[in-house]
A protein has these predicted regions:
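Acyl-donor-binding surface of acyltransferase catalytic domains
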Residues: 3, 7-11, 49-109, 225-230
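Conserved donor-binding loop and adjoining core beta-sheet/short helix segment
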Residues: 11-63, 157-179
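Conserved acetyl-CoA-binding loop-helix of GNAT-fold acetyltransferases
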Residues: 54-66, 179-194, 211-216
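Alpha-helix C-terminal capping segments
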Residues: 75-78, 84-85, 146-148, 165-167, ...
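A mid-sequence, solvent-exposed acidic-amphipathic segment
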Residues: 128-171
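Hydrophilic extracytoplasmic domains
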Residues: 193, 200-232
Length: 232
């Protein structure tokens, strides 16, 4: 890893005040879930419409937007109601699945994340994924979950960090490359742990580079999990 790359990573805020989601935000117009944990990091909030009075979607969203803005959101997205199709489509979360084998010529060295390295692993992942739509920011509160999963790794080649990844129960939860063009080697190195078993992952529709890689390896799109619309 170069000094410039390390310097850029250290510019990412190590910790800010954690903001909790609101599972049931109730108004006279209906109920929604407010996803607020990304507000301190990305200034983004997400609204999942749960229930709405007839003809009152705009009013419900107005209440939600006002609250999200009050806590610092500069961009607000929503899902969960057919009438949202009248708003500007922003992007989707897509599920992909397949059975693929690792290419042994592209498999590098895996180093499991430990208590001593989990904070650095998390910061690297946050830095590399900060501009990827719908990528959740990992906080210090997530470290115990990361460690207990036993599936978080650094990937190295000849002593140089290529990237990081996280596998759990047949799901690829996270993949990021530190070096340009290293994504395929990082992916094959993680695949070496699956022994050809079915693999599932979720990816943003806007992350075309990742989708092309996954499709080239043999994964197929199986479901549009969530469709998001920009409402502020």
């Amino acid at each position: 890893m170069t000094c410039d790359r390390m310097e850029n990573m250290l510019k990412y805020p190590k910790e800010v005040n954690v903001m909790k989601d609101i599972p049931m935000f109730t108004t006279e117009f209906g109920v929604a879930s407010l996803v607020l944990k990304e507000v301190p990091y990305r200034q983004e909030a997400y609204i999942r419409v749960r229930d709405v009075q007839p003809g009152q979607l705009r009013e419900l969203l107005g209440e939600c937007i006002s609250f999200c803005r009050m806590v610092g959101a500069e961009r607000v997205y929503a899902t969960g109601h057919d009438e949202l199709e009248n708003s500007a489509y922003y992007g989707s979360v897509i599920q992909m699945r397949g059975e693929i084998q690792a290419d042994g010529s592209l498999v590098e060295n895996l180093f499991p994340v430990t208590e001593q390295t989990v904070s650095g692993w998390r910061e690297i992942c946050n830095d590399r994924l900060r501009d990827v739509d719908f990528a959740a920011t990992l906080t210090a509160a997530d470290e115990s979950m990361i460690l207990s999963s036993g599936g978080a790794y650094f990937i190295h080649r000849q002593g140089e960090l290529l990237g990081a990844g996280w596998l759990e129960d047949g799901k690829l939860l996270l993949l990021c490359a530190v070096l340009p063009g290293a994504g395929e080697r990082v992916m094959h190195t993680l695949l070496s742990l699956t022994d050809g078993a079915p693999l599932e992952l979720e990816v943003a529709s806007s992350n075309l580079r990742a989708i092309r890689l996954y499709e080239r390896l043999g994964l197929i799109r199986t479901k549009e999990i969530t469709k998001w619309y920009k409402i502020f």
